Amino acid sequence: YPYFSGFREERGEGEGLGFNRNFPLGERVDGRMYRNVLRRALDVVRAFNPVFLVLALGLDPAKGDPTGTWTLSARDFLANGRMVAELDLPTVVVQEGGYRTRSLGSNARHFFQGLSAPFGGS
């Protein structure tokens, strides 16, 4: 999470005012902490009641990623995918972050396994 943008009070501008929500997290975040905040964010999505979801999937919260200090594991990404799947929405995923090549594929695979769980995935 960048520390120079995405502040809680940033709620959008112009016609988009009120349609942006940020959930700032600290410098040290583990999977449990991440899921607690993800749960709140998904509640906001549910309240909005969209007909589809476009998800920007950052895999840089992974443990050992050179861009950060968070410690999410492949199991955490699996759980995150399952949580998103519970929205039961048509979803487009755009992968946009993740720089530790040794774990990037595994983390992506686990997220998509979680996301596909309602369709017979893991």
Model-derived segments and spans:
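A general "terminal functional-core" signal
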Residues: 1-122
